[in-house]
């Protein structure tokens, strides 16, 4: 499945939920949700480029904006690990009103390597240290997104956003609003103009 320039907001559980999916998403906004902006789980091939996972919902959620998980528990309490063949997050924003907006709940380290999993040039809100540093390449911890207006779900960048020009170059030439991308790209689905 390919997704380009899609906005998904206001879901009860998750704006995007994958389970063993083959998915490529570019310039997508996964906004406010009662639980997860993104729940990426149990294997498959997933690629997110210049996507924004931003959850500022006015609920008392305990879940992160983005949950990345490579296993599930069956009905008979058996743990089943399903590693990802590819899981790439490039130039993405993972933000929200909780202290930790990314949870990587993985067991693959016990059965395989993380060679195919990478967060590259992503802005991540987290008070936790990113323990498995091999997963993270040039990521920015707790940078100020400074979105225009999270209360009205406007996740476009303000002029004082720390996400401007932090991305790695890519073949994506425009943003979610079809505005041209700068070199280097801004992080997330919006390019500041």
Label each region the model flagged.
Residues 23-156:
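Predominantly extracellular beta-rich ligand-binding scaffolds that present long acidic/polar faces
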Residues 12, 17, 34, 57, ...:
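Active-site-proximal flexible loops/turns
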Residues 9, 33, 80, 188-193:
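Short, charged low-complexity intrinsically disordered segments located at boundaries
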Residues 1-31:
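Right-handed parallel beta-helix
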Residues 153, 158-193:
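Surface beta-loop-beta hairpin patches that serve as ligand-binding interfaces in beta-rich domains
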